[in-house]
UniProtKB/Swiss-Prot annotation:
Name of encoding gene: Zdhhc5
Additional record remark: In neural stem cells, rapidly degraded through the proteasome pathway following growth factors withdrawal, a strategy used to induce differentiation.
Annotated PANTHER family: ANKYRIN REPEAT AND LEM DOMAIN-CONTAINING PROTEIN 2, PALMITOYLTRANSFERASE ZDHHC5
UniProt modified residues of type Phosphoserine: 247, 296, 299, 345, 380, 398, 406, 409, 415, 425, 429, 432, 529, 554, 621, 684, 694
Organism: Mus musculus
Name the record gives this protein: Palmitoyltransferase ZDHHC5
Main localization, broad class: membrane
């Protein structure tokens, strides 16, 4: 009955309960009206009192069984096993007093029914300790109303028996008046009572047995414990006392309450604001993001203050004014992306003004790599930074100085500590610049083109600003010397010189232009060589003459191992020589100073006796007690003949060693395997180590170097 509110009205389900109530009340009323007055006079006045009490007890239990909540479980709003991805199993097993009891999944109420609970098909609810659905009371009989139903049956049976018995007694007292009205009504009531006594008495007896055994009608009918032990029984007396004397079970459904309407008078009346007056835009996080005022300013001050106090929604982009560190990284990333992907890159100084201080000068802040041939060279060349200014400040992109403090020029800035184990990553073009004595502009161009610092800061710079790509090795532009050198006209490269880090296309173009000039004929008329030795002292020229004498006297060695001094003889063999294993050395690598940064157009003049162009040793003149690092070639390349993997060498005629102005012009040979010069001999040989040479032909001395490198020296 209580569960029927809110559902569709079904008149048919009220027919049984209405008939039962009519028969009960009607028969009892007739009994009291026609039979009880005669019995009170003939038998006892207590007979009507007894029947009245019994009738009230029956009526009370009937009402309680009809209108009381049987113990309905509320339906689950969501599945209990919603965290499971699979469908809930039909049964779950629990153990009660050592006996396994199954709990069935209720698809309607969406939970597992507790033990002794069942879903009523008429009420469409799960009822705790479901017994049966009684149509005569129009309600399910469960844990909460079973007591009243059982008492109703007992009292009704007793009442029927009382009505039938006292009616029969009245008929026997008035057997002569069977045709009378009172006797006829009494006989009719007896027929009704007798008619209902058989089913009611049978039902009462059945429930008495169930209560004594501790079972329900559902368990008895379905035969759940027919062949086993009932875990819910506590004995006959305990079972009866539990049904009749136990406290009522709690109610699981809340009682429906009517909504109370309270009228508030003007002192407590809030101003009504319609949707047309205020437009509120709710963000995803519930914050009021936009208000449009159409009324007065004061009506929205409270709302605005509340929205201002609340935490604002996360912006699509970070607040650069609040997060300084994040602003720095975002500025760097944005500028780098625009400089790499855009056709016309922005000036690099604007990108690096927020960079953390690896270097104190802005001249060292340039892009570490490039994705095209353009890069941002045009912007970087516009910087009015001189070479001398850039040399005063330490730069984490500059080449680490390998010269001791005593041989260091005061104009040079401080460099990083040299690690001999990481010297394999030094650029070979820097050694070429020091070995051949080019003009300062070309030296700095070579240096900026091929310099890769071994310092961890340089590596951190490359990995922080971009990946260490192959293009960044081919055309680097991160050196401040590059900017200063490119500001002036670029001089022609020396004959036979090829940068090891040029692209393949540019190398082929330069090589095609260079081949006609590499003939072993006399030197053509040309501009003064960029390699000038105007300031050479006399004793250096004398040492060159001594070397010529030794070259004439010493026989060539056929299978000699690679000269240790070759590592410092000019330019290293291959760009990949840095990947070859290198040994720590204490040779001229530790004594060589960085490139002198003199103005363009002036020859590089060394401060000490030996010029930079001749400071490297020759093939046969390593310093005693020193060992230079290995090159990227194996010992098998040290024979006179070039190996099969290497192309034929280009022979370049050396200029006369002595000129009227003591000018020494050197031309080195280059291998086509990598386009780099092998070695340039410039120092006197050490004792016990004869140089590599070949027989003289027609006034020209042919000297064989390691790996198939040959020299022709005019005598």
């Amino acid at each position: 009955m209580p569960a029927e509110s809110g559902k569709r009205f079904k008149p048919s389900k009220y027919v049984p309960v209405s008939a039962a109530a009519i028969f009960l009340v009607g028969a009892t009323t007739l009994f009291f009206a026609f039979t009880c007055p005669g019995l009170s006079l003939n038998v006892s006045p207590a007979v009507p009192i007894y029947n009245a009490i019994m009738f009230l007890f029956v009526l009370a239990n009937f009402s309680m069984a009809t209108f009381m909540d049987p113990g309905i479980f509320p339906r689950a709003e969501e599945d209990e096993d919603k965290e499971d991805d699979f469908r809930a199993p039909l049964y779950k097993t629990v153990e009660i007093k050592g006996i396994q009891v199954r709990m069935k999944w209720c698809a309607t109420c969406r939970f597992y029914r507790p033990p002794r609970c069942s879903h009523c098909s008429v009420c469409d609810n799960c009822v705790e300790e479901f017994d049966h659905h009684c149509p005569w009371v129009n309600n399910c009989i469960g844990r909460r109303n079973y007591r009243y139903f059982f008492l109703f049956l007992l009292s009704l049976t007793a009442h029927i028996m009382g009505v039938f018995g006292f009616g029969l007694l009245y008929v026997l007292y008035h057997i002569e008046e069977l045709s009378g009205v009172r006797t006829a009504v009494t006989m009719a009531v007896m027929c009704v009572a007798g008619l209902f006594f058989i089913p009611v008495a049978g039902l009462t007896g059945f429930h008495v047995v169930l209560v004594a055994r501790g079972r329900t009608t559902n368990e008895q009918v379905t035969g759940k414990f027919r062949g086993g032990v009932n875990p819910f029984t506590n004995g006959c007396c305990n079972n009866v006392s539990r049904v009749l004397c136990s406290s009522p079970a709690p109610r699981y459904l809340g009682r429906p309450k009517k909504e109370k309407t309270i009228v508030i008078r003007p002192p407590f009346l809030r101003p009504e604001v319609s949707d047309g007056q205020i437009t509120v835009k709710i963000m995803d996080n519930g914050i009021q993001g936009e208000l449009r005022r159409t009324k007065s300013k004061g009506s929205l001050e409270i709302t605005e203050s509340q929205s201002a106090d609340a935490e604002p929604p996360p912006p699509p982009k970070p607040d650069l004014s609040r997060y300084t560190g994040l602003r720095t990284h975002l500025s760097l990333a944005t500028n780098e992306d625009s400089s790499l992907l855009g056709k016309d890159s922005p000036p690099t100084p604007t990108m690096y003004k927020y960079r953390p201080g690896y270097s104190s000068s802005s001249t060292s802040a340039a892009m570490p790599h490039s994705s095209s041939a353009k890069l941002s060279r045009g912007d970087s060349l516009k910087e009015p930074t001189s070479i001398a200014d850039s040399s005063r400040h330490p730069s984490y992109r500059s080449e680490p100085s390998l010269e001791p403090e005593s041989f260091r020029s005061p104009t040079f800035g401080k460099s990083f500590h040299f690690d001999p184990l990481s010297s394999g990553s030094r650029s070979s073009s820097l050694k070429s610049a020091q070995g051949t004595g080019f003009e300062l502009g070309q030296l700095q161009s070579i240096r900026s083109e091929g310099t890769t610092s071994t310092s961890y800061k340089s590596l951190a710079n490359q990995t922080r600003n971009g990946s260490l790509s192959y293009d960044s090795l081919l055309t680097p532009s991160d050196s401040p010397d590059f900017e200063s050198v490119q500001a002036g006209p670029e001089p022609d490269p020396p004959l036979g010189y090829t940068s090891p880090f040029l692209s393949a296309r540019l190398a082929q173009q330069r090589e095609a232009e260079r081949h006609p000039r590499l003939l072993p004929t006399g030197p053509p008329h040309r501009e003064p060589s960029p390699v000038r030795y105007d300031n050479l002292s006399r004793h250096i020229v004398a040492s060159l003459q001594e070397r010529e004498k030794l070259l004439r006297q010493s026989p060539p060695l056929a299978g000699r191992e690679e000269e240790p001094g070759l590592g410092d003889s000019g330019i290293q063999s291959t760009p990949g020589s840095g990947h070859a294993p290198r040994t720590s050395s204490s040779s001229d690598d530790s004594k060589r100073s960085p490139l002198s940064k003199t103005p363009l157009g002036r020859p590089a003049v060394p401060r000490f006796g030996k010029p930079d162009g001749l400071r490297s040793r020759g093939l046969g003149s390593p310093e005693p007690g020193t060992t230079a690092p290995y090159l990227g070639r194996s010992i098998s390349y040290s024979s006179q003949k070039a190996p099969s993997g290497v192309s034929e060498t280009e022979e370049v005629a050396l200029q006369p060693l002595l000129t009227p102005k003591d000018e020494v012009q050197l031309k080195t040979t280059y291998s086509k395997s990598n386009g780099q010069p092998k070695s340039i001999g410039s120092a006197s040989p050490g004792p016990g180590q004869p140089p590599l040479s070949s027989p003289t032909r027609g006034g020209v001395k042919k000297v064989s170097g390691v790996g198939g490198t040959t020299y022709e020296i005019s005598v």
